[in-house]
């Protein structure tokens, strides 16, 4: 099978398994997709997989690993407020409030209407 089709298959099946809360199987599919990221694949698609994998790791309470995925995604797309939000969320859960505040502030700067980021930032400020 064509490797580009295989990449898309891994991503789409990963999404399905994540939606079904089969997080370990979803992770396996996202890992397989990222193994093919050496191909000339659209960068937005690579960011999507890092985001999906990072979010799946958050559901599994693997916050440090999720941060690594969000670091990679942000390196590719530093203008995506959701990436900064989720990395900030992971930092907040790990009680790394300074890093969380920094990421959530960046998220709000990129999207001033991102109310969830504002709420989490307020929550940290009230601790």
Model-derived segments and their meaning:
Residues 1-127:
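Alpha-helical tetratricopeptide repeat
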């Amino acid at each position: 099978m064509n490797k580009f089709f295989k990449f898309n298959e891994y991503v789409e099946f990963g999404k399905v398994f994540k939606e079904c809360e089969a997080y370990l199987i979803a992770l396996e599919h996202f890992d397989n997709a990222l193994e093919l990221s050496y191909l000339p694949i659209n960068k937005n698609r690579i960011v999507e997989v890092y985001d999906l994998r990072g979010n799946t790791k958050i559901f599994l309470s693997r916050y440090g690993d999720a941060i690594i995925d969000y670091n990679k995604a942000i390196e590719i797309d530093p203008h995506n407020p959701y990436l900064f939000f989720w990395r900030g969320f992971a930092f907040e859960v790990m009680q790394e409030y300074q890093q969380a505040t920094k990421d959530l502030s960046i998220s709000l700067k990129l999207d001033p209407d991102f109310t969830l980021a504002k709420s989490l930032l307020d929550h940290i400020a009230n601790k």
